[in-house]
Regions:
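Enriched - but not universal
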Residues: 9, 63, 83-84, 135, ...
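Secreted/periplasmic proteins that engage bacterial cell-wall peptidoglycan
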Residues: 42-118
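A residue-identity detector for tryptophan
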Residues: 6, 60, 80-81, 132, ...
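Amphipathic alpha-helical interaction segments
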Residues: 14, 88-89, 140, 159
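Acidic, low-complexity intrinsically disordered regions
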Residues: 2, 56, 76-77, 128, ...
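Aromatic- and glycine-rich peptidoglycan recognition patches
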Residues: 26, 121-182
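N-terminal secretory targeting signals
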Residues: 1-54, 169-182
Length: 182
């Protein structure tokens, strides 16, 4: 069996997302195998996605995250979590290549999506994202400040200091089994 990539011939490795939950069936609490991406693979996907959005009058988080992660969801970021429920595993454990899905808030009425580029420790990650800083693609540290350590409240590094607390749903994963073919 060959593993196909989610973007541009990039090889994918597999990882267990301990916080992932299956969206259907009787085994909703069983761990599931999801696609993880090496830093080099993510860098290449980010480069490819950046080239595709360059020259556009505006860079948006949704198409950028879709291109980088391979998670094929459309619509505003605040709709991704509910849409993912029928298509993709979701959970509260960051892994490289997963989409961090921010909830709507007063500051972000349409929500936000970013792709995990590095897991630093259990409460710190780095994400690659578009339009956190207007019309730019950036790599930023994100810390989990939720009382239950479930990534439901996060702060994003803004030039050396972590900004406001942002509500988040969690992580949307690319399932490994969708990558396999004969």
């Amino acid at each position: 069996m060959k593993v196909k990539s989610w973007i541009g011939g990039i090889a994918i490795s597999c990882a267990m997302a301990l916080g992932a939950q299956a969206s259907t069936g009787d085994h909703s609490n069983d761990p599931i195998v999801v696609a993880a991406v090496s830093p080099a693979e993510l860098q290449r996907a980010t480069h490819d996605a950046t080239r595709q959005v360059q020259g556009k009058s505006r860079i948006w988080c949704v198409p950028f995250a879709r291109l980088v992660s391979g998670v094929e969801i459309r619509g505003n970021a605040n709709t991704w979590w509910s849409q993912a429920g029928s298509q993709y595993p979701r959970g509260h454990t960051p892994i490289t290549g997963a989409v961090l899905n921010f909830r709507s808030s007063k500051a972000m009425p349409m929500g936000h999506v970013a792709v995990v580029s590095e897991v630093v420790d259990t409460r710190t990650i780095k994400v690659v994202q578009a339009n956190w800083t207007r019309n730019r693609i950036t790599v930023d540290a994100v810390i989990d400040v939720s009382p239950r350590n479930d990534w439901s409240q996060v702060r994003v590094d803004n030039g050396g200091s972590f900004g406001r607390v942002n509500p988040a749903y969690g992580f949307i994963y690319r399932p490994a089994e969708t990558l396999a073919s004969n």
